[in-house]
């Protein structure tokens, strides 16, 4: 990567994962925490598709490299965070990209997270066995 090339940044979050995504002009390679993207995501096709989805929505999958620093959570949360971060970086690239990404749902934060455990219960909603007598 040359020093004068343009870099677009985006931050994504999902569950407890946070991803800092950089879009750099290139040939479509994905690097996550210094490792190849498919290797990092255990060659899982749904995770890889989620990461590539924003670029494929705009037809730019072979024009930009994705460089990611991600931490927290598991692979599901991390791939979702990378997807949102890449979409935000694409919005920084051009304001015209926002509408198609928004209609596909790549820009919205998924609010689903682990529910906290309550006292008196075994798990978030599982109650101890009820005995009538």
UniProtKB/Swiss-Prot annotation:
For this UniProt record, give its keywords in alphabetical order, as a comma-separated list: Ribonucleoprotein, Ribosomal protein
A biological process (GO) annotation for this entry?
A: translation
Would the keyword Nucleotidyltransferase be found if you checked this record's keyword annotation?
no
**GO terms, molecular function:** RNA binding; structural constituent of ribosome
Q: List the Gene3D superfamilies hit by this protein, alphabetically.
A: 3.30.230.10
Q: Which InterPro entries match?
A: Ribosomal_Su5_D2-typ_SF, Ribosomal_uS9, Ribosomal_uS9_bac/plastid, Ribosomal_uS9_CS, Ribsml_uS5_D2-typ_fold_subgr
Cross-referenced Pfam families, in alphabetical order?
Ribosomal_S9
Q: Name one GO cellular component term.
A: cytosolic small ribosomal subunit
Q: Where is this region: Disordered?
A: 94-133
Record's PROSITE patterns?
Answer: RIBOSOMAL_S9
**Record has Ribosomal protein as a keyword:** yes
Query: Basic residues composition bias: which ranges?
Result: 114-133
Q: Where is the composition biased (Basic and acidic residues)?
A: 95-113
Identify the domain of life.
Answer: Bacteria
Q: Which family is this protein grouped under?
A: Belongs to the universal ribosomal protein uS9 family.
Please give the name of this protein: Small ribosomal subunit protein uS9
């Amino acid at each position: 990567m040359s020093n004068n090339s343009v870099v677009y940044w985006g931050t994504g979050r999902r569950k407890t994962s946070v991803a800092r995504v950089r879009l750099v002009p290139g040939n479509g390679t994905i690097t996550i925490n210094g490792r190849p993207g498919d290797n990092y995501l255990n060659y899982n096709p749904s995770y890889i598709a989620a990461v590539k989805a924003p670029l494929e929505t705009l037809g730019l999958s072979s024009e930009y490299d994705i460089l990611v620093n991600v931490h927290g959570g598991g692979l599901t949360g991390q791939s979702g965070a990378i997807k949102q971060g890449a979409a935000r970086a694409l919005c920084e690239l051009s304001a015209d990209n926002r509408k198609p990404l928004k209609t596909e749902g790549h820009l919205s934060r998924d609010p689903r997270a682990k529910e906290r455990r309550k006292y008196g219960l075994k798990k978030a909603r599982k109650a101890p066995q009820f005995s009538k007598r």
